[in-house]
Amino acid sequence: MVRLIVIFLIIAIIAAIFGFGGVAEGAADIAKIIFYIFLVLLVISVLSRLFRK
């Protein structure tokens, strides 16, 4: 149990360093782009499924 606490503490510290250091901003921009790409792919998939029937 103590091992999990230490692991989560280390992960939290690393996340804080990335979050406060500005590294997360670049990752967030990439995540937004990927989100919109997959949203468009979802809409295309749903529409093609509807028109196929």
UniProtKB/Swiss-Prot annotation:
Keywords: Cell membrane, Membrane, Transmembrane, Transmembrane helix. One of its GO terms (cellular component) is plasma membrane. It comes from the Bacteria. InterPro entries: DUF1328. It holds the Pfam family DUF1328. It is a multi-pass membrane protein. The keyword Transmembrane helix applies. It is found in: Cell membrane. The keyword Cell cycle does not apply. The chain crosses the membrane at residues 4-24, 27-47. Belongs to the UPF0391 family. This is UPF0391 membrane protein GFO_1615. It comes from Christiangramia forsetii (strain DSM 17595 / CGMCC 1.15422 / KT0803).
